Amino acid sequence: MDTQFYDVFVTEGENPTFAYRTGLTTYTEGLRDGIFTALGWNGAGYMALAQDGCDPTILNPADYIAPQAFELELDGQSLMSHWAYEGCERIEGKDNLTFKITLRHTVRPVTVKVCTLLDGACVFSRWLEITNRAQSPAALGRLAVLSGGLETTLRWKNHVKDQSADSPYRL
């Protein structure tokens, strides 16, 4: 039997955090001080949040110029911060899971649903549903549906086996 594994683990409260797992790929993001930020990636299927019940902030948002999990600009105004968490929705499909996080901007009348589709593959699909709640139209200037910092491994050579061995790959 070939089963595909996917799930989302949610921690609500002051710092809502969302940990996705599809196959062995995990991705964590959450709202920190009004910024919806990328918090970490893992290719081994391990979700610290689900395992330990702690805040697994692998990536420190303060270490990155743009830690946001998505980028949005309307009418020349960057909407990178000032987000408030409104809730989330889990939509179970036959062979997949769509998870939607609703964020409301506290300065502009804009709502964003961050939508993630998991199907057990090692990659996931991401899109944004943007609602302009103002009476007038808004010009979309910039959009990135998935962004944020990438992890680095200190002392990475300690994790690599003999580089002199025959292999088509080198670090």
Short names for language-model regions:
Residues D2-L171:
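Polysaccharide-binding surfaces and accessory modules of carbohydrate-active proteins
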